Amino acid sequence: MARDYYDILGVSRSADPDELKRSYRRLARKYHPDVNKEPGAEDKFKEINKAYETLSDPQMRGRYDQFGEAGVSSAAGAGYQDFGDFGGFADIFETFFSGFGGSPQSGRRRSGPARGEDLRFDLKLKFREAVFGGEQQIRISHLESCKTCEGTGAKPGTRPQTCSTCQGSGQVRRMTRTPLGNFTQVSVCPTCNGQGQVVTEKCDSCGGRGQNQVSKKLQIKIPAGVDTGTRLRVSNEGDAGQKGGPPGDLYVYLFVQEDSEFRRDGTNVLSEFKISYLQAILGAQLPVKTVDGEETITIPAGTQPGTVLTLENHGVPRLGNPVSRGDHLITVIIDIPNRISTEERELLVQLASIRAEQTGKGGIEGFLGGIFGR
């Protein structure tokens, strides 16, 4: 399965356009083929480009957030972006070394509200459920803010204290001397785990975590036309945020089960339909199964094996535009019997004589071969 575009760019799903651009430029500098000659760098560069091209467009980003790659136009491609504003090698050098020092405020970890983690749920659908959509009830388990301590983790009547090790910054710094100069190494505070605060009297309900694991049922709306790999976003149903931060989202990944009668090719439904050799020769009006139910199909006289008949607008609705549907393509399979009655054989021999066909050693098979080999 393809990697998540947000993970490729190393940003959260709530990242604003400026944050997306900064991350994109940083990664593009790192993996640009003119700079990075390592194997796989060019493929990584194209992957970064595709992710940014999708997420930098508000409309495409919205479709990606809702449906994943299935909702994004295939035109969002892996072409190179314009690098005219990168500032050359000096800019790349500056980017590379910016993580080793610089302003005391650079890379400062915020100890304030933090968004909750996103969650994933895999959901299996039957073929027709994927075609027409509908609603599915699922049960998930996620973290919710503790109602007793209101998410602080502290016992009611008390409050978290500022960490004395990092003075509330969530980070500790260490100066390192190198031949290139002095550099400041920044790491997460081991006392408060980067939170900037410590809980001295823990809440009895959540054990000081500020969150509890809760199981709940959700009603999920499945759009018509989804397929394996389609991803649906359910806002605010991920894990609860910390310190009043917003909850994450729930991402439902869909997997469509195989069907005994139908297959799918894009928005077209494919199936096979077996008819007798007489129906193929004479033609017929026959009932055939479709995803919409039973329909009548016309078999033209002289239909050949492997003929594909089309039922228009009986395919899969287009994702996001259910009014538009594909077609149902039916491949005709002609059933030639291994055994026939004496009466049938006599009649077929007469037909062969009328057509001046030679039955040959195989008997009537020569006649049938003459018909179906045209």
From Swiss-Prot:
Disulfide links within the chain: none
Keywords (A to Z) from UniProt: Chaperone, Cytoplasm, DNA replication, Metal-binding, Repeat, Stress response, Zinc, Zinc-finger
SMART domains for this protein: DnaJ
GO biological process: chaperone cofactor-dependent protein refolding; DNA replication; protein refolding; response to heat
UniProt cross-references to PROSITE patterns, sorted A to Z: DNAJ_1, DNAJ_2, ZF_CR
GO CC field: cytoplasm
Gene Ontology molecular function terms on file: ATP binding; heat shock protein binding; unfolded protein binding; zinc ion binding
PANTHER family per record: CHAPERONE PROTEIN DNAJ A6, CHLOROPLASTIC, DNAJ HOMOLOG 1, MITOCHONDRIAL-RELATED
Protein name: Chaperone protein DnaJ
Gene name per UniProt: dnaJ
